[in-house]
Swiss-Prot record:
Function according to Swiss-Prot or TrEMBL: Allows the formation of correctly charged Asn-tRNA(Asn) or Gln-tRNA(Gln) through the transamidation of misacylated Asp-tRNA(Asn) or Glu-tRNA(Gln) in organisms which lack either or both of asparaginyl-tRNA or glutaminyl-tRNA synthetases. The reaction takes place in the presence of glutamine and ATP through an activated phospho-Asp-tRNA(Asn) or phospho-Glu-tRNA(Gln).
InterPro entries documented for this protein: Asn/Gln-tRNA_amidoTrfase_suB/E (IPR017959), Asn/Gln-tRNA_Trfase_suB/E_cat (IPR006075), Asn/Gln_amidotransferase (IPR018027), Asn/Gln_tRNA_amidoTrase-B-like (IPR003789), GatB (IPR004413), GatB_C_1 (IPR042114), GatB_Yqey_C_2 (IPR023168), Gln-tRNA_amidoTrfase_suB_CS (IPR017958)
Gene: gatB
Subunit structure: Heterotrimer of A, B and C subunits.
Protein name: Aspartyl/glutamyl-tRNA(Asn/Gln) amidotransferase subunit B
Catalysed reactions listed for this entry: L-glutamyl-tRNA(Gln) + L-glutamine + ATP + H2O = L-glutaminyl-tRNA(Gln) + L-glutamate + ADP + phosphate + H(+); L-aspartyl-tRNA(Asn) + L-glutamine + ATP + H2O = L-asparaginyl-tRNA(Asn) + L-glutamate + ADP + phosphate + 2 H(+)
Keyword Coiled coil: no
EC numbers on record: 6.3.5.-
GO biological process: glutaminyl-tRNAGln biosynthesis via transamidation; translation
Length: 499
């Protein structure tokens, strides 16, 4: 049975070659390590960073006579992930042995699921943009399946000049392999897909998504074709461990295949590796087919069966997911899709924003969280969990602005003080005399002084009203930024005789 093409060709995503346009076809197999205290079939710890071969049971080391026992928590996490992907949950699935030899695979086979996975078809919606008009395009990427499998160990080649070592701490750790349909048509779509998938599993608490630790990695399948033609021969780029590298690997591989085809060559179906230092892919081995692995049901494990009540109970307990929160931010708080997307990228950021926005203007809260808080966090290379400004403190700053106690400019200074020194914003304003000047007569005196000292600019302003901004700036400077900007603007217009 052939793969069905569900996407209509889109010229915006075509790649221009010497002999015409090409379309890149992308599918991904993402390996996500399940958050669980113990491994898929043993009680050994899954904690990251231990000394080599410290978290290894007799089962993980494939000692004779050791039988696997399924970890129920891993099954529960896989089903929760399937529900988060709007996927069909299979009440009966089967574990198979995937046979191949590699030094870090002590059993000589991997326990996986082939014909009957625990999770069937689902979908993820990604947003691409904004375009020059500020619009986003929503694209649905199909999920073909999600199955459970064991991770292999780790081969270490850089510790000795003539020997390699094997660390089995990772051997037997539970993985979800999430297989997409070949629905992506650009590196941007692939990066958006990986980002969205990582966000979903983090919201669900089923995988930490830490690609730098290897707990989430992608095998990227890339092929090219002329628009409207059948799919071309695909190459698989193995174990890409960052979203940026996924984009770079696809860009290089698509160009490589196009160059071969335009020279009259043929694409070999093969497995390739991405060399991040060189920004290119290189051949690793010929690509295996399913029959090469000689799959057969694992005789040591019964079929995995559970009832619909088990699935329904997990569905009820699911947290609110990014798409739902984003829709709520847009529809109930009036945020733009762009701002809402930034705020839901991480659960901790969404929670922080909601606390700040509670009882306040949502747009104003979003501006402060996105521009000021996240800007400061990025500058100091901190995560949201490390912020020195609590939601209550940022909320208090916004309240002071809305009350007219401080101006927007003073608020920026106040935020910096709270960021560096902490404290109650309201108390800091009192102690440091940061309240904005609202006394009309005091502001009027400052305006009169600026106007009388700049008669040449007064004449220019009547011909060029945009110079009003210069006068407002001078008054704000003269008052130390404490004057109410709206009042200053109105008084300047009156004094200059400009409507």
């Amino acid at each position: 049975m052939g793969i069905i093409d569900t996407r209509i060709p889109d010229s915006k995503r075509f790649i221009s070659g010497v002999t015409g346009d090409w379309e890149v076809i992308i599918g991904m197999e993402v390996h996500a390590q399940i958050i669980s205290n113990s491994k898929l079939f043993s009680g050994a710890s899954t904690k990251f960073g231990a000394e080599p071969n410290n978290h290894v049971s007799l089962i993980d080391a494939a000692m004779p006579g050791m039988l696997p026992v399924i970890n129920q928590e891993c099954v529960r996490q896989a089903v929760r992930t399937g529900l988060g992907l709007k996927a069909h949950i299979n009440l009966k699935s089967v574990f198979d042995r995937k046979n191949y030899f590699y030094p870090d695979l002590p059993q000589g086979y991997q326990i996986s699921q082939f014909r009957y996975p625990v999770v069937g078809e689902g979908k993820i919606t990604i947003s691409i943009g904004p375009d020059p008009n500020g619009q986003f395009e929503d694209i649905e990427i199909g999920i073909e399946r999600l199955h459970l499998e064991q991770d292999a160990g780790k081969s270490i080649h850089d510790q000795h000049p003539t020997m390699s070592f094997v660390d089995l701490n990772r051997s037997g750790v539970a993985l979800m392999e999430i297989v997409s349909k070949p629905d992506m048509r650009s590196s941007d779509e692939a990066k958006a897909y990986m980002t969205k998938l990582r966000t979903i599993v983090r919201y669900l608490g089923t995988c930490d998504g830490n690609m730098d630790e290897g707990s989430m990695r992608a095998d990227v399948n890339v092929s090219v074709r002329r628009p409207g033609e059948n799919f071309g021969t695909r190459c698989e780029i193995k174990n890409v461990n960052s979203i940026r590298f996924i984009g770079q690997a696809i860009e290089y591989e698509a160009r490589r295949q196009i160059a071969i085809l335009e020279d009259g060559g043929v694409i070999d179906q093969e497995t390739r590796l991405f060399d991040a230092a060189k920004g290119e892919t290189r051949s690793m081995r010929s690509k295996e087919e399913a029959h090469d692995y000689r799959y057969f049901p694992d005789p040591d494990l019964l079929p995995l069966e559970f009832d619909q009540a088990f699935v329904d109970a997990l569905a009820v307990e699911l947290p609110e997911l990014p798409d739902d929160i984003k829709a709520r931010f847009i529809n109930k708080m009036g945020l733009t899709p762009y701002d809402a997307s930034i705020l839901v990228a991480e659960r901790a950021i969404a929670d922080y924003f909601e606390e700040v926005a509670c009882g306040r203007d949502g747009k104003m809260a979003a501006n402060w969280v996105i521009n000021d808080l996240l800007g400061a966090l990025n500058k100091d290379n901190c995560a949201i969990e490390e912020t020195p400004v609590a939601p209550s403190q940022l909320g208090a700053i916004i309240d002071l602005i809305k009350e007219g106690t401080i101006s927007g400019k003073i608020a920026k200074d106040l935020f910096e003080i709270i960021w560096n020194e902490g404290g109650d914003p309201r108390q800091v304003v009192e102690e440091r005399n940061m309240k904005q000047v609202t006394d009309i007569k005091a502001i009027e005196r400052a305006v009169d002084e600026i106007v009388s000292n700049n008669s040449d600019k007064v004449a220019q302003a009547k011909q060029k009203p945009t110079l009003i901004g210069w006068f407002v700036g001078q008054v704000m400077k003269a008052t130390g930024g404490k004057a109410n900007p709206q009042t200053v603007n109105e008084l300047v217009k009156v004094k200059l005789g400009i409507d």
